[in-house]
């Protein structure tokens, strides 16, 4: 998978160029007939989306997602409340714009020329590529020329439709594919993972997240270069909304918010390990149920699933684990640490988990207050692994190299340098296995993603079994405190990949789902 990145330079250039063109619209707060004034008079920013692990979803009592956090921040920027409408497919999203039922679409939508002819695109904030996937163990296609009739199915409205049409016309005249009128990219990927469908196409971000829960899904081919992802609004002679978006994205780019969100949601999508992920999910089924009550009991300040992920990284949930260096137990505590915490038996599961949780809390309390709240845990974990003093050295080295010592994205890049003489010889606390601390934190983040997604999917499967005739419930209007469906579910919650084809009709085939109430 290609490295994911936010297009900071592109955002800056676009902002500079378009700000000139949109300058008359920038003082939008004083105009009564523009869209920003209408939003502020209404007191609500209306955003339509599709629930995915990257865009917006609810896990427990917490709302998450890159587009959710950006939407909430933009609503705060405008001084209004946020109203989210969840739709089933891409076509319904653009219908919301056409019918003036939404101010913005924030759903991981790919920018393309066809869409730009009918809708106003906002700043580009990350990029994806389109990839064909297959099931591990089945025949991997080496090129589109090897695809036989009936093997490739894509979701309606997917941007791959236009890509495939161009490839068929230019290079693969015998290429055929099917557009399923009912299933989303999410559901098609699930069918591929289960072996009931040969191939489908999704975007690289969607695939990387899906693999954390279904490691048997693998990438066969790259079908496109990196494609920009953006928000969309209605085209209008009034440019106040576009001007406000440009100013907002420029502001969060300059203050570091955009970089922090990139690190949070896109900073751990590479280096997928099939064997490791599969082993982890097997342990979730076979070992975790016995330990889960203890993780829930002692994870007072962090998500219990994160504490469980830390323990798996430390010991693979083996309460008898012992390393050559003398650390032992589920949380692999040293003898001195255990004594300082009042523990009498490091091999006792409850003592180890409670001690590890308290030690981690102590590390978090030492992280400088200037570090953003949501990133403090990663600094604490690095300190947990290599020692607090070496974490301070990593921050100092980051600042010396003109990076941001309060940004985990910046600091983690310097961790491997702590084991290189030209760097550690000039640091206060000297040599450290910084490369191990880097891998340690990244592995924990990946395990947490897998665990959250896997457990959410199991919950949905159990609910579906108890209520087989699930009533379709779209559209759903929510606030940040409202109900939000799980994005990892095999139920029709919407596709992971929202890279739909352009055009005013929005999708290749008409919708087959009807809203529960008129819009």
UniProtKB/Swiss-Prot annotation:
The species is Cronobacter sakazakii (strain ATCC BAA-894) (Enterobacter sakazakii)
The family line of this record is: In the N-terminal section; belongs to the bacterial solute-binding protein 3 family.
Its domain of life? Bacteria
In this chain, the stretch annotated as Non-LT domain covers 33-269
Catalysed reaction equations from the record:
Exolytic cleavage of the (1->4)-beta-glycosidic linkage between N-acetylmuramic acid (MurNAc) and N-acetylglucosamine (GlcNAc) residues in peptidoglycan, from either the reducing or the non-reducing ends of the peptidoglycan chains, with concomitant formation of a 1,6-anhydrobond in the MurNAc residue
Q: Is Cell wall biogenesis/degradation one of the keywords?
A: yes
Protein topology in the membrane: Peripheral membrane protein
Q: What GO cellular component entries does it have?
A: cell outer membrane
**Protein name as it appears in the record:** Membrane-bound lytic murein transglycosylase F
Where in the cell? Cell outer membrane
Region LT domain, as annotated, extends over 270-519
Q: Where is the active site?
A: 314
Q: Which UniProt keywords apply?
A: Cell outer membrane, Cell wall biogenesis/degradation, Lyase, Membrane, Signal
Q: Name one GO biological process term.
A: peptidoglycan catabolic process
Q: What is known of its domains?
A: The N-terminal domain does not have lytic activity and probably modulates enzymatic activity. The C-terminal domain is the catalytic active domain.
Where mainly located?
Answer: membrane
Functional description taken from the UniProt entry: Murein-degrading enzyme that degrades murein glycan strands and insoluble, high-molecular weight murein sacculi, with the concomitant formation of a 1,6-anhydromuramoyl product. Lytic transglycosylases (LTs) play an integral role in the metabolism of the peptidoglycan (PG) sacculus. Their lytic action creates space within the PG sacculus to allow for its expansion as well as for the insertion of various structures such as secretion systems and flagella.
Q: What is its EC number?
A: 4.2.2.n1
- Which segments carry the region annotation Disordered? 495-519
SUPFAM superfamilies from the UniProt entry: Lysozyme-like (SSF53955), Periplasmic binding protein-like II (SSF53850)
Polar residues bias located where?
508-519
**Position of the signal peptide:** 1-32
Tell me the InterPro entries matching this sequence: Lysozyme-like_dom_sf, MltF, Solute-binding_3/MltF_N, Transglycosylase_SLT_dom_1
Q: Does the keyword Membrane feature in the UniProt annotation?
A: yes
Q: Which GO terms describe its molecular function?
A: peptidoglycan lytic transglycosylase activity
């Amino acid at each position: 998978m290609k490295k994911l990145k936010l297009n900071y330079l592109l955002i800056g250039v676009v902002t500079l160029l378009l700000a000139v063109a949109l300058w008359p619209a920038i003082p939008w707060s004083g105009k009564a007939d523009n869209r920003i004034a209408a939003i502020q008079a209404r007191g609500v920013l209306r955003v339509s989306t599709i629930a995915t692990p990257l865009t917006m979803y609810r896990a427990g009592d917490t709302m998450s997602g890159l587009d959710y956090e950006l939407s909430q921040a933009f609503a705060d920027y405008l001084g209004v409340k946020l109203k989210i409408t969840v739709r089933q497919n891409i076509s319904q999203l653009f219908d919301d714009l056409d019918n003036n039922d939404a101010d913005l679409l924030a759903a991981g939508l790919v920018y393309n020329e066809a869409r730009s002819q009918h809708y106003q695109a906002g700043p580009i904030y990350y990029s994806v590529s389109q990839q064909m996937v297959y099931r591990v163990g089945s025949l991997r296609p080496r090129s589109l020329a090897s695809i036989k009739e009936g093997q490739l199915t894509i979701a309606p409205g997917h941007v791959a439709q236009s890509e495939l049409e161009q490839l068929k016309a230019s290079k693969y005249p015998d290429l055929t594919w099917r557009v399923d009128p009912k299933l989303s990219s999410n559901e098609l990927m699930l069918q591929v993972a289960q072996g009931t469908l040969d191939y489908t196409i999704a975007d690289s971000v969607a695939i990387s997240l899906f693999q954390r829960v279904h490691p048997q899904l693998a990438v066969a081919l790259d079908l496109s270069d990196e494609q920009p992802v953006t928000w969309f609004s209605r085209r209008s002679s009034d440019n106040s909304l576009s001007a406000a978006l440009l100013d907002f994205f420029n502001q969060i780019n300059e203050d570091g918010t955009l970089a922090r969100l990139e690190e949070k949601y896109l900073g751990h999508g590479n280096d997928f390990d099939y064997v490791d992920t599969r082993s982890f999910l097997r342990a979730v089924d076979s070992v975790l149920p016995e330990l889960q009550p203890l993780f829930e009991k002692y994870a007072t300040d962090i998500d219990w699933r994160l504490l469980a992920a830390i323990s798996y990284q430390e010991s693979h949930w083996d309460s008898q684990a012992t390393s050559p260096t003398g650390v032992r137990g589920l949380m692999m505590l040293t003898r001195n640490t255990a004594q300082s915490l009042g523990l009498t038996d490091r091999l006792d599961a409850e003592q180890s988990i409670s001690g590890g949780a308290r030690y981690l809390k102590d590390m978090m309390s030492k992280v400088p207050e200037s570090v953003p709240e949501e990133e403090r845990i990663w600094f604490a974990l690095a300190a947990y692994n290599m020692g607090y003093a070496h974490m301070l050295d990593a921050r100092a080295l980051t600042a010396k190299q003109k990076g941001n010592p309060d940004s985990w994205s910046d600091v983690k890049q310097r961790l491997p340098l702590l084991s290189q003489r030209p760097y550690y010889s000039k640091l206060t606390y000297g040599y450290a296995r910084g490369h191990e601390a880097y891998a340690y934190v990244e592995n924990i983040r990946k395990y947490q993603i897998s665990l959250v997604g896997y457990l959410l999917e199991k919950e949905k499967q159990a609910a579906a079994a108890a209520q087989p005739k699930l009533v379709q419930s779209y559209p759903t209007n929510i606030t940040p405190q409202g109900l939000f469906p799980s994005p990892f579910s095999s139920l029709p919650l919407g596709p992971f990949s929202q890279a739909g084809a352009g055009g005013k009709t929005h999708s290749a085939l008409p919708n087959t789902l009807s809203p529960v109430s008129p819009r």
